[in-house]
Design a protein with these regions (language model features):
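C-terminal segment of N-terminal export signals and the immediately downstream linker at the start
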Residues: 1, 5, 20-53
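N-terminal export signals
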Residues: 5-24, 111
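Short alpha-helical hairpin
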Residues: 23-28, 63-70
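Long, well-ordered alpha/beta core segments of mature domains
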Residues: 37, 53-68
């Protein structure tokens, strides 16, 4: 009878040993999940700062505390079509230039009230603007706001 228990325990232990390596959730693996977007860790950090400006930390947790940027990237990677993904990525890459033009410095160095102003101005860009970069920033901010909220 003890032989059966030993074999059963050995089978469970072996199964667990086989499964454990596949349960690795390091940051590098998370970035690989966004293969359609080609997002770098610095762009992911910028997206987190933008989401945190939309939902700032107060008595409740802010967007950065909840890792909303990962949710946004998964939704964009999995739910939007290729053109929308390209528009989102282009807007994310152009956002710091827009922030420098509007607020004077990179977005991460701005005060929270100025960050809010930059986002508001980005969302207020006319849909029929001739500048493709501004149009990309507007679409990026609208998508980010929608998935953040």
């Amino acid at each position: 009878m003890q032989r059966r228990e030993a074999l059963k325990s050995l089978a469970i232990l072996t199964g667990g040993a086989v499964l454990i390596p596949s349960c690795n959730f390091e940051k590098e693996d998370i970035l690989a999940a966004y293969s359609n977007l080609q997002i770098t860790s610095s762009l992911q950090t910028l997206l987190g700062e933008i989401a945190n400006a939309i939902i700032p930390p107060a008595q409740l947790k802010g967007a950065a505390d909840l890792a909303v940027q990962d949710f946004i990237l998964v939704m964009v990677n999995d739910c939007l079509d290729k053109d929308q993904q390209t528009q989102f990525t282009k807007g994310l890459q152009e956002f710091n230039a827009f922030s420098k033009k509007t607020g004077g410095v990179n977005f991460s160095k701005l005060e929270p009230s100025v960050k809010e102003k930059v986002i508001t101005e980005g969302l207020a860009i006319a849909a029929d603007t001739a500048d493709e970069n501004l149009k990309s920033v507007r679409e990026f901010l609208a998508t980010t706001k929608r998935f953040t909220i």
